[in-house]
Amino acid sequence: MSNFFPIPVKAIDKLTDDSVCIRLNLSSVDTNLFNFKSGQYITIEQEIDGTNVRRSYSISSLPEAGIEIGVKLVPNGLMSTFLNSKLKEGDVLNVMPPTGEFFLEIDKTNNKHYVGICSGSGITPVLSMIKNVLKNEPLSCFTLIYGNKSLSSVMYSDEINSFKNDFNDRFLIFNAYSQEEIDGAIKGRIDEYSLKTLFDNNPSLMNSDSYFICGPGNMIENVKNFLDLNSIENNKIKFELFSSPDSAKDENNKTENIEINSNVTICVDGDDFDFELSSNGPAILDAAIEAGADVPFSCKGGVCSVCKAKIIEGTVSMDMNYSLSEDDVEEGFILTCQAHPTSENIYVDYDEM
């Protein structure tokens, strides 16, 4: 089910002191498997210091231009440290084909105004969207609101500047810097206060067709709160978290008072795996791995949705959910890394997508 493919690294470019752009060489695989929509991500698996580590990274390139990812160094992050400091051109990475629900559908007849609001490495999926809109939707325009610590920490700054020069009538950017004061830029983080000032001064932003938000959890919450307060329709808002909010777990969702021992069956690639699981025990994903099932996963934090599956029978509760939409949940989809049984019998299907 995991379906990892060995992919050589074609090139590595330094973006900032603590980030790199990695281009993959797809010549050895069926490139149809690696088709993607702007905004989607790949999952990389690598053995680091004797431990298999999986992480998901958004694709920053145009769909027709192959796959490249931008990786910012995370303090004490196993994968990001490896990719930034140890990976070399020609090395082979184990890569899962692109997936993800945070994407932009391109139509050359569209005449739309898109807004991307992101910070730090959250630029990576939005960058692919910007490129795609500017190249393949000639009637559409894109506004980027981009937060960083300082000018030197901006990923893909040269590319973004080229958009300003080449598409000055269709691309507009507002920069925000939290640790540096620069003329013409927002001073501070992207939050409800800075957005109110920006939108008040640029009222057309309130009438945009779609808002794509990407970055840390607290930034996402602030932006969503601002858009909600201004009655922006939910169907116009898409977001992708690159970390969980500080508010983290909602422990009320977990069944702690009444323990239920459940008979769980999961289906992966047409094969069933059976095991018993307590409602107060590990998540369904961890129990499935323990039972020998080759189930897909990456972040294990309720963010990436790689472990998404569908409940066919029974009920579950989730500790956290930062990636499934309300419609997904209503249709029975769960994040198995966050799911615990709340009924005596559970049937979970990874193939029902």
What are these regions (language model features)?
Residues E290, V306-M353:
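Iron-sulfur (Fe-S) cluster-binding segments and ferredoxin-like electron-carrier domains
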Residues M1-P8, K14, D18, T51, ...:
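Iron-sulfur (Fe-S) cluster-binding modules
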Residues N252-F297:
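N-terminal pre-ligand scaffold of iron-sulfur
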Residues F82-N257, N263-C267, D272:
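FNR/FR-type flavoprotein reductase catalytic core
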Residues S2-V92, M96, N148-S150, N161, ...:
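Ferredoxin-reductase
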Residues S278, P296-V306, T336:
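Cysteine-centered iron-sulfur cluster-binding motifs in ferredoxin-type domains/subunits
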